[in-house]
A protein has these predicted regions:
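Generic structural signal for short, solvent-exposed loop/turn connectors between secondary structure elements
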Residues: 1-2, 195
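Active-site rim/adjacent substrate-binding subdomains
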Residues: 14-177, 182-222
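Bacterial N-terminal signal peptides
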Residues: 2-13
């Protein structure tokens, strides 16, 4: 799922009904929105036979393209209407320019190169829980505080079917958990602190640049 980033949130821009190509022509946004039944299904495991097919490789390419066009930092197959357990993740440096060094440090946010993970299994590796704003390409225009594990390990396959294991903390761990939730039919609004839910412009206007402790205090959450 895409995670949004306006200051404290995961995206630089919310997704509209259409997107513009570099040539200026409008194209239909392929990312399905909350309410679509595929976002509430447990996605199917990708079989060994499926992995090497042109169709599956084309799906991965479409996921990467949609994530980058949004722009977002992650996207799961169900967000393109495909019930398969696969996601892509990439947090490019240019998506972090609106954040101060203090914000980047607090979020433990660093650039992450493109990763494709198929049939992921996520395990928390510490008891630490961390709360920050999240948004989603499938819940366009909104954000809320969500508590997640501070450090996790994911195991699965890459797009070529090779085993991968990745232990990660901070912001990449948040993105990863957000995307795996999509594969289980879970959207971030299921986990959010409901009193913190608001539009992206409201969240940006009130909380951009503020430490998370001050934000939580202002919103009346612990």
């Amino acid at each position: 799922m895409r995670l949004v980033l306006i200051a404290a949130v995961f995206t630089t821009a919310c997704v509209t009904a259409s997107q513009n190509t570099r040539s200026g022509a409008a194209v239909e946004n392929p990312i399905v929105q909350v309410g679509h039944p595929v976002l509430r299904e447990r996605a199917k495991e990708v079989t060994t036979d499926q992995l090497g097919t042109p169709e599956f490789q084309a799906l991965i390419a479409r996921m990467i393209e949609a994530m980058r066009q949004a722009p977002g930092v992650g996207l799961a197959a169900p967000q393109l209407g495909v019930s398969l357990r696969a996601f892509v993740l990439e947090d490019r440096a240019e998506l972090q320019t609106s954040l101060t060094p203090e914000e980047l440090s607090e979020r433990e946010r660093v650039p992450v190169p493109l990763r494709v993970i198929v049939n992921p299994v996520v395990t928390p590796v510490s008891e630490e829980r961390v709360t920050f704003f999240e948004g989603c390409l499938s819940v366009s225009g909104y954000a809320a505080l969500v508590e997640r594990w501070g450090e996790v390990e994911v195991s699965g396959l890459d797009e070529k079917g090779q085993p991968v294991t990745w232990r990660v903390r901070g912001w990449p761990a948040r993105i990863l958990q957000h995307e795996v939730d999509h594969l289980d039919g879970v959207v971030y609004v299921d986990r959010m602190l409901t009193r913190t839910y608001g539009t992206l412009p409201q969240v940006k206007a009130r909380f951009a640049g503020k430490p998370i402790a001050d934000t939580k205090r202002a919103l009346g959450v612990k």
